Amino acid sequence: MEDYIKIEKIGEGTYGVVYKGRHRVTGQIVAMKKIRLESEEEGVPSTAIREISLLKELRHPNIVSLQDVLMQDSRLYLIFEFLSMDLKKYLDSIPPGQFMDSSLVKSYLHQILQGIVFCHSRRVLHRDLKPQNLLIDDKGTIKLADFGLARAFGIPIRVYTHEVVTLWYRSPEVLLGSARYSTPVDIWSIGTIFAELATKKPLFHGDSEIDQLFRIFRALGTPNNEVWPEVESLQDYKNTFPKWKPGSLASHVKNLDENGLDLLSKMLVYDPAKRISGKMALKHPYFDDLDNQIKKM
């Protein structure tokens, strides 16, 4: 740790305090995440350290790079590249009645998908994507942060500050207690974020797991084995769920054109096996008119 100087606290992450820091020798500005683990006395599990070490290999223009992993007093510090703004703060800063430019929505979604495809191709899931861990710079680049941390440390129910970890971006298979899930969980999250890029409002903002599920069901219909084979045998599926009929996504997401709504609907398919992959999403006609400059990035 002697290589880094803490400058100021910049936030509370899922796992602990995040500081802005500077490397003593190079002067490089970094984000320092202090990981607080449930079982402080046992120190950091070796499995977590192994997982985290693998993440240093994830190098991509749309992934926040993990530069260093340090231990101090049995505390783990993760040193990341520093970006000053996250997507939630940016969305909150757009004045009432105004929206993000549609070409920027498209560019951000394209970059998010490129980042996710890169990680998925290396068998790394995110599992906890949300606007707070999408970081942006002033050049129009967006990067995914906190990749792979869920697998290394688990996702706590509450942040150590007792703030509840958001459920708004969580896929229905996770909410219904599926033991086996894979890359489609991230695509669902990106779909909900896509809608929020367009409208500035979370698409499904539940305040409990059941409220979250019911908000999804009201919009997309209550799933059954017909639309999603085996869903009725998932751990938390109840036959007593109200049977809502599918509504129209267009009524919830006003600022997307036909192609945008089509892509969104493919990302929000109930059956994870039929949900569009990141790779296929990048080929969707919605991106046909994306500035070529961005595609080359």
Curated annotation (Swiss-Prot):
<feature type="modified residue" description="Phosphoserine">
    <location>
        <position position="248"/>
    </location>
</feature>
<keyword id="KW-0206">Cytoskeleton</keyword>
<dbReference type="GO" id="GO:0055015">
    <property type="term" value="P:ventricular cardiac muscle cell development"/>
</dbReference>
<feature type="active site" description="Proton acceptor">
    <location>
        <position position="128"/>
    </location>
</feature>
<feature type="cross-link" description="Glycyl lysine isopeptide (Lys-Gly) (interchain with G-Cter in SUMO2); alternate">
    <location>
        <position position="9"/>
    </location>
</feature>
<feature type="cross-link" description="Glycyl lysine isopeptide (Lys-Gly) (interchain with G-Cter in SUMO2); alternate">
    <location>
        <position position="6"/>
    </location>
</feature>
<keyword id="KW-0132">Cell division</keyword>
<keyword id="KW-0832">Ubl conjugation</keyword>
<dbReference type="GO" id="GO:0042752">
    <property type="term" value="P:regulation of circadian rhythm"/>
</dbReference>
<dbReference type="GO" id="GO:0005524">
    <property type="term" value="F:ATP binding"/>
</dbReference>
<dbReference type="GO" id="GO:0005634">
    <property type="term" value="C:nucleus"/>
</dbReference>
<dbReference type="GO" id="GO:0003682">
    <property type="term" value="F:chromatin binding"/>
</dbReference>
<dbReference type="GO" id="GO:1902850">
    <property type="term" value="P:microtubule cytoskeleton organization involved in mitosis"/>
</dbReference>
<keyword id="KW-0498">Mitosis</keyword>
<dbReference type="GO" id="GO:0070301">
    <property type="term" value="P:cellular response to hydrogen peroxide"/>
</dbReference>
<dbReference type="GO" id="GO:0004693">
    <property type="term" value="F:cyclin-dependent protein serine/threonine kinase activity"/>
</dbReference>
<dbReference type="GO" id="GO:0016301">
    <property type="term" value="F:kinase activity"/>
</dbReference>
<dbReference type="GO" id="GO:0042307">
    <property type="term" value="P:positive regulation of protein import into nucleus"/>
</dbReference>
<feature type="modified residue" description="Phosphoserine">
    <location>
        <position position="178"/>
    </location>
</feature>
<feature type="domain" description="Protein kinase">
    <location>
        <begin position="4"/>
        <end position="287"/>
    </location>
</feature>
<keyword id="KW-0090">Biological rhythms</keyword>
<feature type="modified residue" description="Phosphotyrosine; by WEE1 and WEE2">
    <location>
        <position position="15"/>
    </location>
</feature>
<dbReference type="GO" id="GO:0007077">
    <property type="term" value="P:mitotic nuclear membrane disassembly"/>
</dbReference>
<feature type="modified residue" description="N6-acetyllysine; alternate">
    <location>
        <position position="9"/>
    </location>
</feature>
<dbReference type="GO" id="GO:0044772">
    <property type="term" value="P:mitotic cell cycle phase transition"/>
</dbReference>
<dbReference type="GO" id="GO:0035173">
    <property type="term" value="F:histone kinase activity"/>
</dbReference>
<dbReference type="GO" id="GO:0030332">
    <property type="term" value="F:cyclin binding"/>
</dbReference>
<feature type="modified residue" description="Phosphothreonine; by CAK">
    <location>
        <position position="161"/>
    </location>
</feature>
<feature type="modified residue" description="Phosphothreonine">
    <location>
        <position position="141"/>
    </location>
</feature>
<dbReference type="GO" id="GO:0030855">
    <property type="term" value="P:epithelial cell differentiation"/>
</dbReference>
<dbReference type="GO" id="GO:0005759">
    <property type="term" value="C:mitochondrial matrix"/>
</dbReference>
<dbReference type="GO" id="GO:0004674">
    <property type="term" value="F:protein serine/threonine kinase activity"/>
</dbReference>
<dbReference type="GO" id="GO:0009636">
    <property type="term" value="P:response to toxic substance"/>
</dbReference>
<protein>
    <recommendedName>
        <fullName>Cyclin-dependent kinase 1</fullName>
        <ecNumber>2.7.11.22</ecNumber>
        <ecNumber>2.7.11.23</ecNumber>
    </recommendedName>
</protein>
<dbReference type="GO" id="GO:0034501">
    <property type="term" value="P:protein localization to kinetochore"/>
</dbReference>
<dbReference type="GO" id="GO:0048511">
    <property type="term" value="P:rhythmic process"/>
</dbReference>
<dbReference type="GO" id="GO:0097122">
    <property type="term" value="C:cyclin A2-CDK1 complex"/>
</dbReference>
<feature type="cross-link" description="Glycyl lysine isopeptide (Lys-Gly) (interchain with G-Cter in SUMO2)">
    <location>
        <position position="20"/>
    </location>
</feature>
<keyword id="KW-0597">Phosphoprotein</keyword>
<feature type="binding site">
    <location>
        <position position="33"/>
    </location>
    <ligand>
        <name>ATP</name>
    </ligand>
</feature>
<comment type="similarity">
    <text>Belongs to the protein kinase superfamily. CMGC Ser/Thr protein kinase family. CDC2/CDKX subfamily.</text>
</comment>
<dbReference type="GO" id="GO:0014075">
    <property type="term" value="P:response to amine"/>
</dbReference>
